[in-house]
Protein backbone atom coordinates (compact mmCIF):
# COMPACT_ATOMS: atom_id res chain seq x y z
CA UNK A 1 0.00 0.00 0.00
CA UNK A 2 1.38 3.38 -1.04
CA UNK A 3 2.18 5.83 1.66
CA UNK A 4 0.91 9.42 1.67
CA UNK A 5 4.06 10.86 0.08
CA UNK A 6 3.86 8.40 -2.81
CA UNK A 7 0.21 9.30 -3.43
CA UNK A 8 1.03 13.01 -3.48
CA UNK A 9 3.90 12.38 -5.90
CA UNK A 10 1.67 10.32 -8.18
CA UNK A 11 -1.03 12.98 -8.10
CA UNK A 12 1.48 15.70 -9.00
CA UNK A 13 2.64 13.60 -11.97
CA UNK A 14 -0.90 13.20 -13.24
CA UNK A 15 -1.56 16.92 -12.90
CA UNK A 16 1.70 17.74 -14.67
CA UNK A 17 0.89 15.42 -17.56
CA UNK A 18 -2.64 16.90 -17.74
CA UNK A 19 -1.24 20.44 -17.79
CA UNK A 20 1.16 19.51 -20.58
CA UNK A 21 -1.69 17.94 -22.55
CA UNK A 22 -3.89 21.02 -22.13
CA UNK A 23 -1.05 23.30 -23.20
CA UNK A 24 -0.52 21.18 -26.29
CA UNK A 25 -4.22 21.27 -27.12
CA UNK A 26 -4.42 25.04 -26.65
CA UNK A 27 -1.38 25.62 -28.83
CA UNK A 28 -2.93 23.50 -31.54
CA UNK A 29 -5.97 25.78 -31.65
CA UNK A 30 -4.17 29.11 -31.49
CA UNK A 31 -5.09 31.00 -34.71
CA UNK A 32 -2.06 32.50 -36.42
CA UNK A 33 -2.35 36.17 -37.35
CA UNK A 34 -2.55 35.36 -41.06
CA UNK A 35 -5.64 33.18 -40.65
CA UNK A 36 -9.23 34.38 -40.95
CA UNK A 37 -10.87 36.08 -38.00
CA UNK A 38 -14.35 35.13 -36.77
CA UNK A 39 -17.23 36.25 -38.97
CA UNK A 40 -19.83 38.09 -36.96
CA UNK A 41 -20.84 41.35 -35.36
CA UNK A 42 -20.94 43.09 -32.03
CA UNK A 43 -22.72 46.21 -30.91
CA UNK A 44 -22.41 48.95 -28.35
CA UNK A 45 -24.32 52.16 -27.77
CA UNK A 46 -22.55 53.91 -30.65
CA UNK A 47 -21.71 51.42 -33.42
CA UNK A 48 -22.39 48.09 -34.97
CA UNK A 49 -19.03 46.42 -35.61
CA UNK A 50 -18.94 43.86 -38.42
CA UNK A 51 -16.03 41.45 -38.84
CA UNK A 52 -16.08 40.05 -42.38
CA UNK A 53 -14.06 37.02 -41.40
CA UNK A 54 -11.31 38.21 -43.73
CA UNK A 55 -9.06 41.22 -43.19
CA UNK A 56 -11.79 43.86 -43.04
CA UNK A 57 -13.64 45.07 -39.97
CA UNK A 58 -16.02 48.01 -40.33
CA UNK A 59 -18.33 49.99 -38.10
CA UNK A 60 -21.69 51.60 -38.81
CA UNK A 61 -23.01 54.34 -36.54
CA UNK A 62 -26.30 53.45 -34.91
CA UNK A 63 -27.43 57.07 -34.92
CA UNK A 64 -27.22 57.95 -38.62
CA UNK A 65 -25.86 55.02 -40.66
CA UNK A 66 -22.43 56.51 -41.36
CA UNK A 67 -19.55 54.12 -41.87
CA UNK A 68 -17.41 55.30 -38.96
CA UNK A 69 -14.49 52.89 -39.34
CA UNK A 70 -12.87 50.83 -42.11
CA UNK A 71 -10.13 48.71 -40.57
CA UNK A 72 -8.15 46.69 -43.09
CA UNK A 73 -5.24 44.61 -41.81
CA UNK A 74 -5.31 46.53 -38.55
CA UNK A 75 -5.29 50.07 -40.00
CA UNK A 76 -8.34 52.33 -40.07
CA UNK A 77 -8.69 53.99 -43.48
CA UNK A 78 -12.01 55.74 -42.93
CA UNK A 79 -12.64 59.45 -42.78
CA UNK A 80 -10.88 62.78 -42.30
CA UNK A 81 -11.55 65.98 -40.33
CA UNK A 82 -14.45 64.33 -38.48
CA UNK A 83 -16.14 63.30 -41.73
CA UNK A 84 -17.25 59.72 -42.33
CA UNK A 85 -18.35 57.70 -45.35
CA UNK A 86 -22.06 58.12 -46.06
CA UNK A 87 -24.93 58.96 -48.38
CA UNK A 88 -24.75 62.56 -49.62
CA UNK A 89 -23.15 64.65 -46.84
CA UNK A 90 -24.57 62.39 -44.15
CA UNK A 91 -28.03 61.59 -42.88
CA UNK A 92 -29.72 62.82 -39.75
CA UNK A 93 -31.12 60.65 -36.96
CA UNK A 94 -31.98 57.34 -38.58
CA UNK A 95 -33.38 53.93 -37.72
CA UNK A 96 -30.33 51.65 -37.99
CA UNK A 97 -30.71 47.89 -37.49
CA UNK A 98 -28.52 44.85 -38.01
CA UNK A 99 -29.38 41.26 -38.89
CA UNK A 100 -27.75 38.02 -39.98
CA UNK A 101 -30.01 36.56 -42.68
CA UNK A 102 -27.74 33.52 -43.05
CA UNK A 103 -24.57 32.06 -41.60
CA UNK A 104 -22.54 33.82 -44.31
CA UNK A 105 -24.29 37.22 -44.58
CA UNK A 106 -24.61 40.19 -42.22
CA UNK A 107 -26.78 43.15 -43.20
CA UNK A 108 -27.18 46.65 -41.78
CA UNK A 109 -30.29 48.58 -42.78
CA UNK A 110 -30.51 52.36 -42.44
CA UNK A 111 -33.88 54.11 -42.76
CA UNK A 112 -34.00 57.89 -43.01
CA UNK A 113 -37.43 59.11 -44.00
CA UNK A 114 -38.21 57.47 -47.34
CA UNK A 115 -34.56 56.60 -48.01
CA UNK A 116 -33.10 53.19 -47.25
CA UNK A 117 -29.38 52.38 -47.25
CA UNK A 118 -28.05 48.83 -46.93
CA UNK A 119 -24.58 47.55 -46.05
CA UNK A 120 -24.03 43.84 -46.62
CA UNK A 121 -20.99 41.75 -45.65
CA UNK A 122 -20.29 38.25 -46.94
CA UNK A 123 -18.21 35.82 -44.94
CA UNK A 124 -14.55 35.75 -45.92
CA UNK A 125 -14.68 38.78 -48.24
CA UNK A 126 -12.98 42.16 -47.93
CA UNK A 127 -16.00 43.79 -49.53
CA UNK A 128 -19.02 45.80 -48.45
CA UNK A 129 -22.00 45.49 -50.78
CA UNK A 130 -24.12 48.64 -50.75
CA UNK A 131 -27.63 49.44 -51.94
CA UNK A 132 -29.56 52.71 -51.91
CA UNK A 133 -33.34 52.86 -52.20
CA UNK A 134 -34.78 56.25 -53.18
CA UNK A 135 -38.57 56.57 -53.04
CA UNK A 136 -39.06 60.26 -53.80
CA UNK A 137 -37.52 63.73 -53.57
CA UNK A 138 -38.14 64.19 -49.86
CA UNK A 139 -34.50 63.26 -49.17
CA UNK A 140 -31.69 64.84 -51.21
CA UNK A 141 -29.60 62.02 -52.63
CA UNK A 142 -26.97 62.56 -55.32
CA UNK A 143 -24.15 60.20 -54.37
CA UNK A 144 -22.51 57.88 -51.88
CA UNK A 145 -19.12 59.14 -50.72
CA UNK A 146 -16.38 56.92 -49.32
CA UNK A 147 -14.02 59.22 -47.43
CA UNK A 148 -10.48 57.94 -46.82
CA UNK A 149 -7.58 59.22 -44.75
CA UNK A 150 -5.34 61.29 -47.09
CA UNK A 151 -2.22 60.56 -45.05
CA UNK A 152 -2.45 56.90 -46.09
CA UNK A 153 -2.58 57.48 -49.86
CA UNK A 154 -0.50 59.49 -52.36
CA UNK A 155 -1.71 62.57 -54.22
CA UNK A 156 -1.92 61.16 -57.72
CA UNK A 157 -0.67 62.84 -60.87
CA UNK A 158 -4.13 63.16 -62.41
CA UNK A 159 -6.50 65.95 -63.34
CA UNK A 160 -8.78 65.15 -60.40
CA UNK A 161 -5.96 65.22 -57.83
CA UNK A 162 -4.44 68.40 -56.44
CA UNK A 163 -2.93 70.08 -53.38
CA UNK A 164 -4.82 72.27 -50.94
CA UNK A 165 -2.32 75.08 -51.57
CA UNK A 166 -3.60 75.54 -55.14
CA UNK A 167 -5.69 78.63 -55.89
CA UNK A 168 -9.43 78.54 -56.52
CA UNK A 169 -10.26 79.28 -60.14
CA UNK A 170 -14.02 78.77 -60.32
CA UNK A 171 -16.95 78.09 -57.97
CA UNK A 172 -14.86 76.63 -55.12
CA UNK A 173 -14.47 73.34 -57.01
CA UNK A 174 -11.96 74.13 -59.78
CA UNK A 175 -8.37 74.91 -58.85
CA UNK A 176 -5.18 76.05 -60.52
CA UNK A 177 -1.50 75.66 -59.80
CA UNK A 178 -0.43 79.25 -60.44
CA UNK A 179 3.17 78.19 -61.00
CA UNK A 180 2.20 76.16 -64.09
CA UNK A 181 -1.27 77.36 -65.04
CA UNK A 182 -2.53 73.77 -64.87
CA UNK A 183 -6.10 73.24 -63.66
CA UNK A 184 -7.65 70.52 -61.50
CA UNK A 185 -11.08 69.52 -60.23
CA UNK A 186 -13.15 66.65 -58.91
CA UNK A 187 -15.11 67.10 -62.16
CA UNK A 188 -12.14 66.17 -64.35
CA UNK A 189 -12.42 62.39 -64.27
CA UNK A 190 -12.10 62.17 -68.08
CA UNK A 191 -14.29 59.07 -67.93
CA UNK A 192 -17.75 58.22 -69.21
CA UNK A 193 -19.90 55.90 -67.10
CA UNK A 194 -19.76 53.18 -69.74
CA UNK A 195 -15.94 53.24 -69.78
CA UNK A 196 -15.17 52.27 -66.19
CA UNK A 197 -16.06 49.44 -63.84
CA UNK A 198 -14.45 50.78 -60.70
CA UNK A 199 -12.69 53.75 -59.20
CA UNK A 200 -10.29 53.93 -56.32
CA UNK A 201 -6.81 54.51 -55.04
CA UNK A 202 -3.82 52.42 -53.96
CA UNK A 203 -0.67 53.07 -51.98
CA UNK A 204 0.96 49.92 -53.33
CA UNK A 205 0.13 47.82 -50.29
CA UNK A 206 -3.55 48.59 -49.84
CA UNK A 207 -6.15 49.51 -52.42
CA UNK A 208 -9.61 50.90 -51.70
CA UNK A 209 -12.14 50.86 -54.54
CA UNK A 210 -15.78 51.41 -55.37
CA UNK A 211 -16.95 48.95 -58.01
CA UNK A 212 -19.87 50.78 -59.58
CA UNK A 213 -23.37 49.41 -59.91
CA UNK A 214 -25.08 48.93 -63.26
CA UNK A 215 -26.53 52.46 -62.82
CA UNK A 216 -29.97 51.32 -63.93
CA UNK A 217 -31.58 53.83 -61.55
CA UNK A 218 -29.03 56.57 -62.15
CA UNK A 219 -29.37 59.21 -64.87
CA UNK A 220 -27.45 60.52 -67.84
CA UNK A 221 -26.98 57.46 -70.02
CA UNK A 222 -23.78 55.73 -71.13
CA UNK A 223 -21.85 58.89 -71.99
CA UNK A 224 -22.47 60.77 -68.76
CA UNK A 225 -19.38 62.16 -67.05
CA UNK A 226 -19.52 62.96 -63.37
CA UNK A 227 -17.64 62.64 -60.10
CA UNK A 228 -15.69 59.42 -59.74
CA UNK A 229 -12.75 60.18 -57.46
CA UNK A 230 -10.82 63.13 -56.13
CA UNK A 231 -7.81 63.10 -53.89
CA UNK A 232 -5.72 65.81 -52.31
CA UNK A 233 -3.34 66.17 -49.40
CA UNK A 234 -6.34 66.81 -47.12
CA UNK A 235 -9.06 64.53 -48.53
CA UNK A 236 -9.61 61.35 -50.54
CA UNK A 237 -13.13 60.73 -51.88
CA UNK A 238 -14.58 57.88 -53.92
CA UNK A 239 -18.06 58.24 -55.40
CA UNK A 240 -21.01 56.16 -56.50
CA UNK A 241 -23.28 58.62 -58.31
CA UNK A 242 -26.99 58.16 -57.69
CA UNK A 243 -28.38 61.32 -59.29
CA UNK A 244 -26.05 64.22 -60.01
CA UNK A 245 -27.53 67.44 -61.32
CA UNK A 246 -24.48 68.93 -63.05
CA UNK A 247 -24.85 68.83 -66.85
CA UNK A 248 -27.79 66.48 -66.39
CA UNK A 249 -30.09 65.90 -69.37
CA UNK A 250 -32.01 62.92 -68.06
CA UNK A 251 -34.93 62.28 -65.72
CA UNK A 252 -34.38 61.43 -62.07
CA UNK A 253 -35.17 57.79 -61.43
CA UNK A 254 -36.42 56.23 -58.22
CA UNK A 255 -36.06 52.80 -56.72
CA UNK A 256 -33.08 50.64 -55.77
CA UNK A 257 -29.55 51.29 -57.03
CA UNK A 258 -27.03 48.60 -56.29
CA UNK A 259 -25.15 46.66 -55.44
CA UNK A 260 -22.11 48.87 -55.63
CA UNK A 261 -19.15 47.43 -53.79
CA UNK A 262 -16.53 48.97 -51.52
CA UNK A 263 -13.62 46.60 -52.02
CA UNK A 264 -10.27 46.47 -50.20
CA UNK A 265 -7.26 44.73 -51.74
CA UNK A 266 -3.56 44.28 -51.02
CA UNK A 267 -2.80 47.06 -53.50
CA UNK A 268 -4.03 45.53 -56.73
CA UNK A 269 -7.21 46.06 -58.69
CA UNK A 270 -10.53 44.70 -57.42
CA UNK A 271 -11.69 41.35 -58.75
CA UNK A 272 -13.48 41.51 -62.09
CA UNK A 273 -16.05 39.15 -60.56
CA UNK A 274 -17.40 42.22 -58.75
CA UNK A 275 -18.07 44.18 -61.96
CA UNK A 276 -21.73 44.98 -62.54
CA UNK A 277 -21.85 42.83 -65.67
CA UNK A 278 -20.17 39.85 -64.00
CA UNK A 279 -21.47 39.82 -60.42
CA UNK A 280 -23.51 36.78 -59.40
CA UNK A 281 -26.49 38.08 -57.42
CA UNK A 282 -28.65 35.06 -56.60
CA UNK A 283 -27.49 35.22 -52.96
CA UNK A 284 -29.16 38.65 -52.68
CA UNK A 285 -32.61 37.33 -53.61
CA UNK A 286 -33.47 36.17 -50.08
CA UNK A 287 -32.24 39.25 -48.17
CA UNK A 288 -35.48 41.21 -48.38
CA UNK A 289 -33.87 44.37 -49.74
CA UNK A 290 -36.56 46.88 -50.73
CA UNK A 291 -36.88 47.13 -54.51
CA UNK A 292 -34.58 44.23 -55.34
CA UNK A 293 -35.44 42.35 -58.55
CA UNK A 294 -33.53 39.13 -59.16
CA UNK A 295 -32.48 37.71 -62.49
CA UNK A 296 -35.70 35.73 -62.91
CA UNK A 297 -37.66 38.98 -62.94
CA UNK A 298 -35.58 40.51 -65.71
CA UNK A 299 -35.37 40.23 -69.48
CA UNK A 300 -33.09 40.70 -72.47
CA UNK A 301 -32.97 42.44 -75.84
CA UNK A 302 -30.77 41.17 -78.68
CA UNK A 303 -30.27 42.60 -82.15
CA UNK A 304 -29.23 40.46 -85.12
CA UNK A 305 -27.18 43.27 -86.61
CA UNK A 306 -26.93 46.91 -87.70
CA UNK A 307 -26.52 48.06 -91.30
CA UNK A 308 -25.01 51.32 -92.57
CA UNK A 309 -22.45 51.52 -89.79
CA UNK A 310 -19.41 53.66 -90.57
CA UNK A 311 -15.92 52.32 -89.97
CA UNK A 312 -13.79 53.97 -87.28
CA UNK A 313 -16.85 54.73 -85.13
CA UNK A 314 -18.09 52.95 -82.04
CA UNK A 315 -21.78 52.09 -81.97
CA UNK A 316 -23.61 51.92 -78.66
CA UNK A 317 -27.20 50.82 -78.12
CA UNK A 318 -28.98 52.58 -75.26
CA UNK A 319 -32.30 51.83 -73.58
CA UNK A 320 -34.17 54.28 -71.37
CA UNK A 321 -37.51 55.10 -69.81
CA UNK A 322 -38.53 56.89 -66.64
CA UNK A 323 -37.80 53.78 -64.56
CA UNK A 324 -34.43 52.52 -65.77
CA UNK A 325 -31.54 52.89 -68.22
CA UNK A 326 -29.17 50.39 -69.86
CA UNK A 327 -26.65 50.25 -72.67
CA UNK A 328 -24.46 47.83 -74.57
CA UNK A 329 -21.89 48.01 -77.35
CA UNK A 330 -22.64 46.72 -80.83
CA UNK A 331 -20.21 44.41 -82.61
CA UNK A 332 -17.79 46.29 -84.86
CA UNK A 333 -18.09 43.64 -87.54
CA UNK A 334 -21.85 43.22 -87.96
CA UNK A 335 -23.62 45.29 -85.32
CA UNK A 336 -24.88 42.38 -83.23
CA UNK A 337 -25.80 43.45 -79.70
CA UNK A 338 -27.26 41.96 -76.54
CA UNK A 339 -28.45 43.75 -73.40
CA UNK A 340 -29.23 41.55 -70.40
CA UNK A 341 -30.71 41.84 -66.90
CA UNK A 342 -33.20 44.55 -67.84
CA UNK A 343 -36.25 45.39 -65.76
CA UNK A 344 -39.54 44.72 -67.57
CA UNK A 345 -41.06 47.67 -69.42
CA UNK A 346 -41.15 49.57 -72.69
CA UNK A 347 -37.95 51.45 -73.52
CA UNK A 348 -36.81 53.95 -76.09
CA UNK A 349 -33.96 52.17 -77.84
CA UNK A 350 -31.37 54.50 -79.36
CA UNK A 351 -28.41 53.56 -81.52
CA UNK A 352 -25.52 56.00 -81.17
CA UNK A 353 -22.71 56.57 -83.64
CA UNK A 354 -20.08 57.48 -81.08
CA UNK A 355 -22.40 59.78 -79.10
CA UNK A 356 -24.82 60.91 -81.81
CA UNK A 357 -28.28 59.33 -81.96
CA UNK A 358 -28.78 57.91 -85.46
CA UNK A 359 -31.70 55.54 -84.90
CA UNK A 360 -34.54 55.25 -82.37
CA UNK A 361 -37.42 52.88 -81.80
CA UNK A 362 -39.42 51.41 -78.92
CA UNK A 363 -38.84 47.95 -77.53
CA UNK A 364 -40.65 46.02 -74.79
CA UNK A 365 -38.88 43.80 -72.27
CA UNK A 366 -40.63 41.02 -70.36
CA UNK A 367 -39.52 39.13 -67.27
CA UNK A 368 -37.68 35.97 -68.25
CA UNK A 369 -38.01 36.77 -71.95
CA UNK A 370 -35.69 37.69 -74.80
CA UNK A 371 -36.77 40.20 -77.44
CA UNK A 372 -35.01 39.45 -80.73
CA UNK A 373 -34.76 42.33 -83.20
CA UNK A 374 -34.16 41.78 -86.89
CA UNK A 375 -31.33 43.58 -88.65
CA UNK A 376 -31.65 47.37 -88.31
CA UNK A 377 -30.68 49.87 -91.00
CA UNK A 378 -29.51 53.29 -89.81
CA UNK A 379 -31.35 56.01 -91.71
CA UNK A 380 -30.71 59.13 -89.61
CA UNK A 381 -26.96 59.62 -89.97
CA UNK A 382 -26.43 63.19 -91.24
CA UNK A 383 -23.04 62.22 -92.65
CA UNK A 384 -24.94 60.38 -95.40
CA UNK A 385 -26.07 63.72 -96.84
CA UNK A 386 -24.33 65.24 -99.87
CA UNK A 387 -22.63 68.49 -98.92
CA UNK A 388 -20.66 71.32 -100.48
CA UNK A 389 -18.26 71.24 -97.53
CA UNK A 390 -18.15 69.94 -93.99
CA UNK A 391 -16.06 70.79 -90.91
CA UNK A 392 -15.69 67.97 -88.41
CA UNK A 393 -17.61 64.73 -88.07
CA UNK A 394 -21.22 64.03 -87.18
CA UNK A 395 -20.54 61.92 -84.12
CA UNK A 396 -22.02 63.85 -81.20
CA UNK A 397 -18.66 65.03 -79.85
CA UNK A 398 -16.22 67.93 -80.37
CA UNK A 399 -13.20 65.67 -79.94
CA UNK A 400 -11.78 66.22 -83.43
CA UNK A 401 -11.65 70.00 -82.99
CA UNK A 402 -8.93 72.13 -81.41
CA UNK A 403 -8.69 71.44 -77.64
CA UNK A 404 -11.60 69.01 -77.95
CA UNK A 405 -9.81 65.97 -76.55
CA UNK A 406 -8.68 67.93 -73.47
CA UNK A 407 -11.98 69.40 -72.31
CA UNK A 408 -12.80 66.43 -70.09
CA UNK A 409 -9.44 66.78 -68.33
CA UNK A 410 -9.03 70.50 -67.65
CA UNK A 411 -10.58 73.95 -67.53
CA UNK A 412 -10.70 76.04 -70.74
CA UNK A 413 -8.28 78.49 -69.07
CA UNK A 414 -5.59 75.82 -68.65
CA UNK A 415 -2.15 76.86 -69.92
CA UNK A 416 -1.68 73.58 -71.80
CA UNK A 417 -4.42 74.43 -74.28
CA UNK A 418 -3.96 76.01 -77.68
CA UNK A 419 -5.36 79.46 -78.42
CA UNK A 420 -9.14 79.65 -78.56
CA UNK A 421 -8.85 81.82 -81.64
CA UNK A 422 -8.63 80.24 -85.06
CA UNK A 423 -10.43 80.85 -88.33
CA UNK A 424 -10.93 78.10 -90.89
CA UNK A 425 -10.27 77.86 -94.64
CA UNK A 426 -12.34 75.20 -96.39
CA UNK A 427 -10.10 72.93 -98.44
CA UNK A 428 -6.97 73.91 -96.54
CA UNK A 429 -7.58 73.76 -92.80
CA UNK A 430 -8.07 70.67 -90.65
CA UNK A 431 -10.80 70.33 -88.04
CA UNK A 432 -8.06 70.27 -85.41
CA UNK A 433 -7.36 73.94 -86.17
CA UNK A 434 -10.94 75.03 -85.42
CA UNK A 435 -11.87 75.57 -81.73
CA UNK A 436 -14.20 73.01 -80.17
CA UNK A 437 -15.99 75.67 -78.10
CA UNK A 438 -17.10 79.18 -78.99
CA UNK A 439 -17.45 81.52 -76.00
CA UNK A 440 -19.20 84.84 -76.47
CA UNK A 441 -16.63 86.60 -74.29
CA UNK A 442 -13.50 84.75 -75.47
CA UNK A 443 -13.48 83.81 -79.16
CA UNK A 444 -16.74 84.99 -80.64
CA UNK A 445 -17.00 85.79 -84.33
CA UNK A 446 -14.89 82.95 -85.73
CA UNK A 447 -14.78 83.02 -89.52
CA UNK A 448 -14.99 80.19 -92.04
CA UNK A 449 -13.66 81.09 -95.49
CA UNK A 450 -14.97 79.17 -98.50
CA UNK A 451 -15.32 79.47 -102.27
CA UNK A 452 -18.18 78.34 -104.48
CA UNK A 453 -18.20 77.62 -108.19
CA UNK A 454 -20.67 79.47 -110.37
CA UNK A 455 -23.28 76.73 -110.24
CA UNK A 456 -23.06 76.50 -106.46
CA UNK A 457 -23.20 80.26 -105.99
CA UNK A 458 -26.37 80.50 -108.06
CA UNK A 459 -28.61 78.60 -105.65
CA UNK A 460 -29.75 78.58 -102.06
CA UNK A 461 -27.87 76.41 -99.58
CA UNK A 462 -28.68 74.93 -96.19
CA UNK A 463 -26.20 75.68 -93.45
CA UNK A 464 -26.26 73.18 -90.58
CA UNK A 465 -24.53 73.75 -87.26
CA UNK A 466 -24.55 70.79 -84.90
CA UNK A 467 -23.79 71.35 -81.22
CA UNK A 468 -23.23 68.91 -78.37
CA UNK A 469 -24.40 71.40 -75.76
CA UNK A 470 -24.55 75.05 -74.82
CA UNK A 471 -24.28 77.27 -71.75
CA UNK A 472 -26.83 79.88 -70.52
CA UNK A 473 -28.77 80.04 -73.75
CA UNK A 474 -25.81 80.32 -76.08
CA UNK A 475 -26.55 79.69 -79.76
CA UNK A 476 -24.95 80.74 -83.02
CA UNK A 477 -26.43 83.42 -85.25
CA UNK A 478 -24.51 83.00 -88.52
CA UNK A 479 -23.85 85.56 -91.19
CA UNK A 480 -22.56 84.99 -94.72
CA UNK A 481 -20.96 88.07 -96.20
CA UNK A 482 -23.64 90.77 -95.78
CA UNK A 483 -26.49 88.33 -95.02
CA UNK A 484 -27.40 87.54 -91.39
CA UNK A 485 -29.83 84.88 -90.25
CA UNK A 486 -32.87 85.49 -88.12
CA UNK A 487 -32.38 85.09 -84.38
CA UNK A 488 -32.42 81.35 -83.63
CA UNK A 489 -34.14 80.00 -80.54
CA UNK A 490 -32.14 78.53 -77.70
CA UNK A 491 -31.96 74.75 -77.59
CA UNK A 492 -33.00 72.72 -74.55
CA UNK A 493 -29.88 72.31 -72.41
CA UNK A 494 -28.90 71.69 -68.76
CA UNK A 495 -29.25 74.70 -66.50
CA UNK A 496 -25.86 74.22 -64.86
CA UNK A 497 -22.27 74.84 -65.84
CA UNK A 498 -21.26 72.69 -68.77
CA UNK A 499 -18.06 73.51 -70.66
CA UNK A 500 -15.94 74.14 -67.56
CA UNK A 501 -16.78 70.99 -65.56
CA UNK A 502 -15.17 68.29 -67.66
CA UNK A 503 -17.96 67.57 -70.08
CA UNK A 504 -19.10 68.77 -73.48
CA UNK A 505 -22.28 66.75 -73.45
CA UNK A 506 -25.64 68.43 -73.10
CA UNK A 507 -28.36 67.72 -75.63
CA UNK A 508 -27.16 67.26 -79.20
CA UNK A 509 -28.99 69.72 -81.41
CA UNK A 510 -28.72 70.80 -85.04
CA UNK A 511 -29.53 74.32 -86.21
CA UNK A 512 -30.55 74.62 -89.85
CA UNK A 513 -30.44 77.89 -91.80
CA UNK A 514 -31.41 78.56 -95.41
CA UNK A 515 -28.80 80.85 -96.95
CA UNK A 516 -30.14 82.58 -100.09
CA UNK A 517 -28.12 82.61 -103.30
CA UNK A 518 -27.98 86.41 -103.06
CA UNK A 519 -25.72 86.05 -100.02
CA UNK A 520 -22.84 84.47 -101.97
CA UNK A 521 -20.11 86.13 -103.99
CA UNK A 522 -20.63 85.74 -107.72
CA UNK A 523 -16.92 85.93 -108.46
CA UNK A 524 -15.72 82.38 -107.92
CA UNK A 525 -12.24 83.62 -106.98
CA UNK A 526 -13.59 85.61 -104.04
CA UNK A 527 -13.76 84.12 -100.58
CA UNK A 528 -17.12 83.92 -98.90
CA UNK A 529 -17.04 84.60 -95.17
CA UNK A 530 -19.22 82.66 -92.75
CA UNK A 531 -19.12 84.41 -89.39
CA UNK A 532 -20.20 82.51 -86.28
CA UNK A 533 -21.54 84.75 -83.53
CA UNK A 534 -22.74 83.36 -80.21
CA UNK A 535 -25.79 85.21 -78.91
CA UNK A 536 -27.84 84.85 -75.74
CA UNK A 537 -30.31 86.68 -73.55
CA UNK A 538 -28.15 85.83 -70.54
CA UNK A 539 -24.88 87.36 -69.47
CA UNK A 540 -21.61 85.91 -68.25
CA UNK A 541 -17.93 86.61 -68.54
CA UNK A 542 -14.88 84.81 -69.86
CA UNK A 543 -15.37 81.04 -69.85
CA UNK A 544 -18.70 81.40 -68.07
CA UNK A 545 -20.11 83.55 -70.85
CA UNK A 546 -22.73 82.08 -73.22
CA UNK A 547 -21.10 79.35 -75.27
CA UNK A 548 -21.61 76.38 -77.58
CA UNK A 549 -19.76 73.12 -78.12
CA UNK A 550 -19.40 72.20 -81.80
CA UNK A 551 -20.22 68.79 -83.23
CA UNK A 552 -20.16 69.56 -86.96
CA UNK A 553 -20.71 72.42 -89.42
CA UNK A 554 -21.69 71.86 -93.04
CA UNK A 555 -23.04 73.63 -96.09
CA UNK A 556 -25.33 71.44 -98.15
List the predicted regions and their residue ranges:
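A short, solvent-exposed beta-strand micro-motif common in secreted/extracellular proteins
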Residues: 335, 345-355
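Extended, loop-rich substrate-binding clefts of extracytoplasmic carbohydrate-active enzymes
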Residues: 80-131, 143-145
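Structured interaction patches on ligand/partner-binding surfaces of diverse proteins
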Residues: 355-381
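A short, amphipathic beta-strand motif
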Residues: 297-309, 335-337, 376
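Beta-strand-rich ligand-recognition modules
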Residues: 334, 443, 449-458, 466-556
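Short, acidic Ser/Thr/Gly-rich low-complexity loop/linker segments typical of extracellular
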Residues: 321-336
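Short, ordered, surface-exposed loop/turn motifs in non-cytosolic proteins
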Residues: 299-301, 307-325
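A contiguous, surface-exposed recognition patch within enzymatic or periplasmic domains that forms
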Residues: 149-255
